[in-house]
Each structure stands twice: as C-alpha cells, then as structure tokens.
Amino acid sequence: MKKIYFTFLVPIFLYSQNLEELVNLTIENRLVESSKQNLDALKDEYKSVQRGYLPKLDAGASYSINEHEYPSTPKKRANAYGSVNYMLYDGGKKYDIYDGYETNIKSGEKSLDALKNNLSLTVIQYYFDYLSLEAKKDAKQKEIEQLTAQEDRIGRFYNAGTTTEDELQKIVSRLQNAIVELQEIELNIITITHNLEYITGTQVSITDGSKLEDINNLIQKNPRFDIQALDFVTQSKQSVAQAQKSGYYPTVTLDNTFNYYDNNYDKFIDTDSNNHQNVASANMKWNLFSFGQTKYQYESKQKEYLASRSNFEYEKNKADVDLQLALKSYNIAKAKIKSTEATLKAAQSAYEIIKSKFENGLIDNVAFLQSLTEKYDAISQHKKAINDLEVKKATIIYHSGEKLQEYIR
C-alpha cells in the first residue's frame, strides 16, 4: 500500500512549481529563444560590417588561348594576380554606421528584457488569479457541504410533514446553482493551467506560498524596458540620418595589385622580358553634384528620426502615467484588504447567529441562504484581495523598469 501511495505522489512532486519556477521556465521559452537568436543575428551582422572596413585581399588567375596570334597577342597566356584594397576614408559614414548598429543592439537587449518582463507579469497574474480561484473553489465546496447538510435536514422535516415543499426546493435550487458555479470555477482554473502550460512550454502543477518582495522602498531608477528600447531605436535612427551626410565628402581608397603573366608564342618571339607588374594607387572620388540626392536622403532619414523621437516621448509620458496609476491602484488594493477583512468578520458573525435562529425555526431559509452565500463570498473575496495586492506590486515593479524575477520570494 505504501508503494502505491508513493507512486501516485511522484508525478505531483515532479511537476509542482511555485511562482519563481514558473517565471524561470517562461523567460526561457521558445518566444524568448527566438528573440535571442534575432539579437545574435544582429550582432553577427555588425561584426560583418566591421570586417568589411578592414583591408581586403583578393587573388585570381586566368588562362587563355587566342585563335590568331599577333606580336602583342600571344597564342597562349597565363595570368595570376593578387590585390589589396583598403577604404581609407568614406566621408565619416563608417562611425555613424557603427553607432547605429551599437544602439540597435542595445535596443534589442532591452527589447529582450521587456519581453521577459511582459511574460513574467503575465505569469504572475495567472498565478495569483489561480490562487484566488482555488480559494473561491474551496469556499464554494464548503458552501455546498453546508447546503447538502441543510438539504438532508430539511428533507427529513419534509418527510415528517413539519415543513413545506417550497422550503425544501429553495435549498435544492440553491445547491444546484452552487454546483454549477463550482463547475465554472473549475473550468477557469483549468483554463489558467492550460495558458501557463502554453507559456512555459511544460506541464504545470501550481503550489502556493510565493509572494513578491515589499516595494515601499522601491525607487524608479530607469524607465520601463520597452521605453529604453524605444530610446535606443531613436538614437539608431539619428545615426542613420547622420550617415547620409557622408555623401557631401570624398572617399579615399588605397589599392595595390601584383600581376604575374606567362606568354607563349608559336610564330613570334616574346620581346617583353618582364613577366610581372606591381601597381600601387591612391584613389579619391568626390561627388560634387547629384541634383540634391544626398540632401533628400538626409532629410528623409532625419524626419524618420524626429518621428521616432516624438513616438518615444509620447510612450515615455504614457509610461509615467501608467506608473502613477499603478501606485494608486496599489494603495486602493491595500485598503481593499482591510475592507474585505471587516466584511468577512461581519459575515461570519451574522452567519452564526442566523444559522442558529434558522435551525431553531425562528426565521425562514431565505435569510439563512443569503447569510450562507455572503459568508463564503466574503471568504473568497478577502483571499482574492490579498492575491490582487501581489499583482499590483508586480505591476509597479514592471513599470519601474526592474526585473520581476528578482523580486519573487
């Protein structure tokens, strides 16, 4: 019997997770992994661009056979060459491109943090909603137990002819409604569980006991992660706009090419004793007039930058308002806990009195049923208020630009 008991416990133990474990699973899911790969791809692209500005070494060879031979055109010719090319100056575009990539990478990193925080907040909401539903389920089950007991009690009185059928049917009706409500609660619990399994990518079984750290001393040091990402995107667009100005300046390249060739004549004598040639050159190119092409390219990118800056300022102000609303919501949630606690005490006290009067035949079952419902509703509402406070704390941490997983205990 002990072996069977242990066998049933093992799966529960293996798949049971608290809030910290659920969040850790979530921030390593496939969506996050996809974002990481995109960020790595951007970093590799930046490395490629950097390498593109280093000297380039090329080599090549050719072999040709001509139909007609002339003194300057051998019958057969072999050629091999090697060349080195270096962009000495590109009008300053290189450094603006570098700045653009670096800020884009920083934006990608902050976007990744924002994604993790968004997912973490979603999991936290699911977790505490799950606990609230479990508390509501427990209260509803106890209400059903009370209603079932009263159904048996009133049923005996009805069979004895000491009470009317409508008194019994009121209890039966309330019991059936409570059973349906319990089924709806269980469906909501299953829905949350499935949503968590979808986000985490694994089977979950939730354990309670997790909370978030106190936030009374929390100071906002940085904007929200997505706002930081927008800021870096804006900086990147500014760098791209500045890069367009390079069209006003010259480009300078350095080249060195070494050629080796072997000429084979059938009819003529090769009079050229040299079989190699080395050419070193410095080249400058300066576009003096292009009908305003560079001007309009710059203005186009500058307008994109200004649009991005306006969007950033708008979202930043909106995020500041969201934080202030979250703080007010948190204070209301704390007050709600005190309110529901007082309501619970009053409901429990009233229920005990009304139950005693009902069982002694001093009042009808309408008042009793109302009192019973109010008691268990008060229990579930109080526990929900406690759980909602944790969600409010998480929302403040989220809007304060902090990583949620660091505040779970």
Set out the residue ranges of the language-model regions.
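Short, charged, amphipathic alpha-helical segments
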Residues: 99-102, 165-176, 299, 365-376
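Acidic, low-complexity, intrinsically disordered peripheral segments
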Residues: 381-409
